[in-house]
Amino acid sequence: MARTKKANDEVPTNSDSLKLKVAKQAAKLVKDEMVVGLGSGSTANLFIQELGKRIVEEELYIYGVPTSFDSRMVASTAGIPLISLDQCGEIDIAVDGADEVCKSTLSLIKGGGGCHTMEKIVDYHAKEFIVLADEGKLVDSLGDKTPVPLEVIPFAYSTVLNKLLKMNTAPAIRTGSGKMGPVITDSGNMIIDVFISIDDAEETENMLNNIPGVLENGVFSKCDKVLVGTSKKVEILKK
């Protein structure tokens, strides 16, 4: 008897297949006895699952450093031993996703899931920071389609909003589904999303972080390599 499709069944998309393709490729880059930064988000979760398979099948000794409660749960389910940032002297490689990737500079916008602060701490601490993306995430310039998220201390949200308004932007407090009120990060802070023109990623990153009350923003100016899933192959972009 044929199974009746339910309304909430997830149907794999072309984007999903491209994400899985780059996740599998990235998992092959991890070597035995490495400490790996585990990013957050749908693509990073696929990488975590593929890495877990390798650990089990090849009996590898690998430790993961999660960047969110979500990545911690996915890694635990995948069988990846976890350690905290203060337990590891070095992180050999960090693998994460992105919301936008600038083709010419490999700068990024991250934080659609509200995890960018802990992601940036881990990603920037790693010896090598690798980003996974499907070809739909590539852009000529950052910020035209995707807002930059700012993690903001709740005490300062109104002053941060006022500062952003004076910069001729249109900031918005991020609200969530399943609860009333603003999205609250794993660290207990709020998210303000703002569309802003980004000509120089490092300059914008530093400028936004200099606003009192902003803990961290979603502009990532540092990235070593991007694995891009296309319909034909996985392309590798390097600086």
UniProtKB/Swiss-Prot annotation:
Pathway membership: Carbohydrate degradation; pentose phosphate pathway; D-ribose 5-phosphate from D-ribulose 5-phosphate (non-oxidative stage): step 1/1
BP GO annotations: D-ribose metabolic process; pentose-phosphate shunt, non-oxidative branch
Gene Ontology molecular function terms on file: ribose-5-phosphate isomerase activity
Catalytic activity line of the entry: aldehydo-D-ribose 5-phosphate = D-ribulose 5-phosphate
Annotated disulfide bonds: none
Functional summary from the UniProt entry: Catalyzes the reversible conversion of ribose-5-phosphate to ribulose 5-phosphate.
Binding site for substrate: 40-43, 96-99, 110-113, 137
Enzyme Commission number(s) from the entry: 5.3.1.6
UniProt-listed InterPro entries: NagB/RpiA_transferase-like, Ribose5P_isomerase_typA_subgr, Ribose5P_isomerase_type_A
Family per record: Belongs to the ribose 5-phosphate isomerase family.
Name of the top EC class for this enzyme: isomerase
Quaternary data: Homodimer.
Protein name as it appears in the record: Ribose-5-phosphate isomerase A
Lineage: Archaea, Methanobacteriati, Methanobacteriota, Methanomada group, Methanococci
Pfam families: Rib_5-P_isom_A
